[in-house]
Amino acid sequence: IIVWSLGNEAGYGPNFEKAYDWIKSYDQSRPVQYEQARHDGKTDIFCPMYMGYEDCEKYAQTDNPRPLIQCEYAHAMGNSIGGFKEYWDIIRKYPKYQGGYIWDFVDQGLRDKSKITGREIFTYGGDYGRYPASDNNFNCNGIIAPDRRLNPHAYEVRYYYQNVNRRSEERRVGKECRS
């Protein structure tokens, strides 16, 4: 466990504040995050959803000591994850902006056989008759497929995650070197 989470999208109020207080009394070594706590509530991490680039940069420039880690960002529905580079340009520029969690990371589909073709397919929800079948991909919207193969946009994520940034000082000349 590196961070305790009180979840997200569940409102905010005294029960969440009591939960935060209990966790902190039990374990002071780890931060606690809760998306609905926003700027002023009980959270050690400012963790909004889908904050735009400009707002991320503005927050990173404030004197608020809480790091910014988006609890959802870079929505990966279909073959999209547009704007990932722009987020990572800001993340690398400001140490306070520490990243985010891609929604969704893994497709939530079930392996089955097509009743029409007999081919293996991934199914969900309406494919089982509970509500009208849909060609939308609300459950199969991750960067990794249900069989754990990489979807096309996973390669873009890998590209931006690949760098190891470092700073060192050139001893002979006394100049800072960045790479």
Regions found by a protein language model. Give the residues of each.
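Short "domain-exit" segments at the C-terminal end of structured domains
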Residues: 174-179
